[in-house]
């Protein structure tokens, strides 16, 4: 299509990529009207967050979409990194939140994405630190201990609250992965 009159009229410069500008303007409102995709490390996170949003913010629940993990999508922090890179590479335009656990694997995986040039519609974050995890019982090769597990062992279950995490008034300890009590 001839746009000479638009260039002559000052609406565009000769070097402007008019078709790219037009496409950007057309899709500009699309992401704001589409669901926000929430990506998590596993099915439990998605199920809990979906149910929590529906319970606490029912008027907002239709604004979010979760990865359908029933289709055998792999879980874990490493898999989430691959999914985020795939979304970026495929040009998925929905606003997307990649939510990692607040543990060692989650922080390590999220840091891998810091050097990746992600589009502005994708944000990467971890669950926040919580006061309950500042002094939490753990079980591992050095025996039972009480320490901060913020940043090292906070999966979504630690955000359920003290009442859910206790048995007979005692917090259920975090068992360090790979630790087998039988090998003491």
Predicted regions mapped to residue ranges:
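Acidic, divalent-metal-binding catalytic cores of TOPRIM
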Residues: 1-184
């Amino acid at each position: 299509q001839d746009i000479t009159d638009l260039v002559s009229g000052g609406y565009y410069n000769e070097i402007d990529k008019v078709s790219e500008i037009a496409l950007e303007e057309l899709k500009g409102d699309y992401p704001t009207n589409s669901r926000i995709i929430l990506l998590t490390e596993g099915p439990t996170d998605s199920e809990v967050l979906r149910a929590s949003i529906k319970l606490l913010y029912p008027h907002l629940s239709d604004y979010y979409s979760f990865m359908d993990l029933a289709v055998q999508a792999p879980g874990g922090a490493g898999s989430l990194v691959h999914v985020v890179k795939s979304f970026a590479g495929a040009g998925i335009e929905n606003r997307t939140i990649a939510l990692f656990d607040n543990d060692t694997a989650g922080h390590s995986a999220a840091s891998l994405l810091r050097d990746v040039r992600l589009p502005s519609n994708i944000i990467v974050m971890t669950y926040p630190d919580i006061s309950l995890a500042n002094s939490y019982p753990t079980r591992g090769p050095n025996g039972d201990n009480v320490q901060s597990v913020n940043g090292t062992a906070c999966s979504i279950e630690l955000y359920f609250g003290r009442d859910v995490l206790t048995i007979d008034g005692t917090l259920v300890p975090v068992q360090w992965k790979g630790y087998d009590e039988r090998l003491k």
